[in-house]
């Protein structure tokens, strides 16, 4: 598959695709006799993985290390290191998801109670009487 087809399939820019290869986030891609990149299924899997992990916030550095390890001769130690990288990234993603869920829950709470809160403020002369202790609400 040629670069333009990969770009369309994966919904990424040519610059991003070239950058991934340049920095080592994906393994080197084979080229045809004219020097054009030819992507195989393995390359597409790497691009798909990298795109999704980047969207999830995984660092370029972690992806470079993961790819570097993948290109070494296979042994249990290398595979354990790769799995460790993935586990660490999953932990970080779960922490970020918790923060996002907490923020979403707070926003939903504020939206659900907004009219009532505004009514209390409008009915009172002192705004401080109506300060809600959001950090205690759980």
Regions found by a protein language model. Give the residues of each.
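Append "Primarily bacterial transcriptional regulators
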Residues: 6-7, 20, 39
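Residue-level "edge-of-site" marker
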Residues: 20, 33, 66
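Minor-groove-contacting beta-hairpin "wing" of winged helix-turn-helix DNA-binding domains
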Residues: 34-41
